[in-house]
């Protein structure tokens, strides 16, 4: 008999044994989790060989880090561009989710991969991997891309343009002073533009008033926020627990619930539109959601990669794509148009010339707001292009996931399946060899004063020195529609409102957030409704709110 038997009861002894076993299991599990994380990162580091790696020094997922290392990612990326890219050498960068590494190729190497077929180098597979979309939506389905390409054709663009301007007349007074209200109103710039764009984007997918009673706008916004929330939750978790987090995390479960709620609201409407299109009653079917359905019907299939009709209904498939396309619409519109407004606050000298140009264009177009007016606004085109150059949201562009082994001949580099590659677009756009005095905003940089023109094709056509829309086979298919929509929102604000000057001329207009440049959250916008009878001289007056 053990001496402990005199002081420890059998039940206590059993409790100790269970506690000890639990501690051992916890310890072993913890070791496995940490070891899996280290092994995952070791694999990724090994895959890039001797290529210099720029990262924060940690090889663990954020949740496993005792203390976050101090790391100025933007400065390190800029330094690597000067040290490696400018000398024709690649470098590797630990991506936003901390689990993958992307090889940043020198700009001149882009032509060696960006025209390869998608079966060899895929942008959408890169997006799926980066944003954990494998359990959310199949972004590799080609139908949405083809639908957006159709939207850029002349007739759909014309109809969508009229929808956008009509919708702007309805939503602008919800966030800024309406007709007859000439008092100054101050709002947070980024927040206001984000809310405005979310309302505007709904008009590209649904007819006015649809879903108001069921709270569609609120649910679509919850989808956007939830998509970001699930990304943060999964990228911070240890690699081996990522799928468990998706199934059990409250954030992820709320997001999944939001998807189901949106489906319940939108599926009946999608079903109605499918029947309408199949019955050849197509006159009222021209929104992006309609083009998506039409393209799927044209292809004769509603099945995505790895999916069958038994796994998901036709309507749910369409709704999932609408939700994701909505997010893809809102994010760039918000990031770009906010900076456009910030720039006229900092540079009011552009206000009068741009208004005069818009006024002339409106007269040419019979006084009717449509995308056609931007064919007569070269200064506006140059201003927009300078925004895209200096304030493009992305730090890298032209990203691809290698689907089949390829070679970059100029570097003598073989890339294996699963490798991520990209180009350093932000630093290409701010390289003085590409653009003189690159950090100075010049709204007329691309305006040819001699001919009075600015070619929109140069805005939309990617090159090794111009990458706001990606490049090659995976360049953004919505670049024309997106550019025109941003210009429409900016033009309506410019013509309908006075906007106060920015007092602090040195406050950064953007901030770096995990590889994305977002509008500064601290800048406020002061706006006042303009009097339509204001004289031409008043257009050039100093636009600053009264104290």
Swiss-Prot record:
Q: Which UniProt keywords apply?
A: Alkaloid metabolism, Heme, Iron, Membrane, Metal-binding, Monooxygenase, Oxidoreductase, Transmembrane, Transmembrane helix
Q: What is its main location?
A: membrane
Q: What does this protein do?
A: Cytochrome P450 monooxygenase; part of the gene cluster that mediates the biosynthesis of campesine G, a dimeric indole piperazine alkaloid that shows good insecticidal activity Galleria mellonella. Within the pathway, cpsD acts as a dimerase that simultaneously catalyzes one C-C bond (C3-C3') and two C-N bonds (C2-N16' and C2'-N16) coupling reactions between campesines B and C to produce a heterodimer with unexpected 6/5/6/6/6/6/5/6 eight-ring scaffold called campesine D.
Catalyses: campesine B + campesine C + reduced [NADPH--hemoprotein reductase] + O2 = campesine D + oxidized [NADPH--hemoprotein reductase] + 2 H2O + 2 H(+); 2 campesine B + reduced [NADPH--hemoprotein reductase] + O2 = campesine F + oxidized [NADPH--hemoprotein reductase] + 2 H2O + H(+); campesine C + campesine A + reduced [NADPH--hemoprotein reductase] + O2 = campesine E + oxidized [NADPH--hemoprotein reductase] + 2 H2O + 2 H(+)
* GO molecular function per UniProt: heme binding; iron ion binding; monooxygenase activity; oxidoreductase activity, acting on paired donors, with incorporation or reduction of molecular oxygen
Name the UniProt record assigns to this protein: Cytochrome P450 monooxygenase cpsD
- GO BP, sorted A to Z: alkaloid metabolic process; secondary metabolic process
PANTHER family in the cross-refs: CYTOCHROME P450
Superkingdom of the source species: Eukaryota
Q: Which residues bind heme?
A: 476
Q: In which pathway does it act?
A: Alkaloid biosynthesis
- Give the membrane topology, semicolon-separated if more than one: Single-pass membrane protein
Where found? Membrane
Q: Which Gene3D superfamilies match?
A: Cytochrome P450
UniProt lists compositionally biased (Basic and acidic residues) regions at 534-547
- Could you say which protein family the record assigns here? Belongs to the cytochrome P450 family.
Name the CDD domains for this protein: CYP503A1-like (cd11041)
Tell me its cofactors. heme
